[in-house]
Amino acid sequence: IEPSRGLGDVYKRQTMGEPQTYFLETLGCPKNQVDSDKLEGRFAADGLTPVDSPDEADIVVVNTCAFIDEARQESVDTILSLGDQRREGAKLVVTGCMAERHGDEIADSLPEVDQVAPFGIDITGSTAVPVSLGPTRRAPDFDLLNLPRPASARPWSYVKIAEGCDRACGFCAIPTFRGPQRSRSIDQILTEVDELQAREIVLVAQDLAAYGRDQGMGERSIIPLVRQIADRVD
């Protein structure tokens, strides 16, 4: 396993002329679900086809959570379970918070995993984008935040309006691997809302109340955003 290498080779067609298939399992919070939606949009753009079962997939991707001990254990259990369920020759890829926070440990202790993809790795790209947030808390060069998403299959949808956090709470490690606050522009968010075609929008972020501060929008800048979104949905 090479945690910092790009995943382009993993995503090469295994059989020429046949569409490649993937299975994506998402763990953790609604923000992780948004990340998975954006990964699926990227997969679709690259010609990958989703399947309903890991034993039908050429690639099995686990979007992990590492917020608390129980979440980390669930991530490990899921990785092991999907590793057992995948068909012979299928690749097992681990991404998400656990891949970023504990990538080296996963690589060392879980031989079932073929690739660890921390934040900043373009999963479908051919070039690695190495990321090490650590004490410098650098933002990923490749960011899921503004990737397009497919239309929502449900009447409601989560929309992530910012990534990262500027607070330094002693009980929370999220800023060390999600990076500093990065707010999206109102135009970017409204475009995503329109494309989702959902009747109800739930806004999510690591720190919703801080939306816009890093962009110089001032305090309570989330209020005009909410009003504009409300004008667009039923």
What does each model-found stretch correspond to?
Residues 1-14:
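Single conserved hydrophobic/aromatic residue that forms the stacking wall/gate
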Residues 12-212:
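Proteins enriched for Cys/Gly/acidic motifs involved in redox and nucleic-acid/cofactor modification
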Residues 5, 184, 220:
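Residue-level signal for the nucleotide or nucleotide-sugar donor/cofactor binding architecture
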Residues 218-234:
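Alpha-helix-loop-beta-strand connector modules within alpha/beta enzyme cores
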